[in-house]
Amino acid sequence: MTDTTAHKYPLLATPHVRLHGTVDDAMYDSFCNQLAACPKDGMLVVTITTLGGDPEVARAMGDDIRLIREFQGRDILFLGKVAVYSAGATFMSAFPVEHRFLTHGTRLLLHERQITKTINLNGPLRMVVASLQAALNEVETSVAIEEEGFRDLIKGSKVPFDELHEKAPSNWYIEAEEARSLGLVLDII
């Protein structure tokens, strides 16, 4: 028999909620349906494999996890498999570090939020100023949300905010072993 940590965490072998693919409305629907079918008490296990997607959907799923934890007093474990990129890492940030696991060979991708926007300046000057201010407000709010998520992700880990803030613009890929050594996850199975 090979040396393995799996025997320490037998619950991870039979997850209650299995998510894969793009983080989008369809994943959120699947997530809600699977949660509704879960046992009403005891620890839950949620797995995800994703190349990313909509960060706001990831935040909504994470908020559901937080509400279950706070209102029902339940422990919920996170298991990232193969790829936990972008919005997947946003979802992972909803789980305390001591409830996060990755499978061998899994990679995390942490990066800044992206925006593509064309601003058409046309009309009375005050309307132009208002349009520019609205776009700036959108960007500033998105940066604030991103920073909140980054702080949640690294809370309880060895990663200083400044390091994540410095590496995120150029896509920070983190191997499972590095994630464990940085304290971003409890263990690798």
Enumerate the predicted regions with their spans.
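Terminal-region recognition feature
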Residues: 1-189
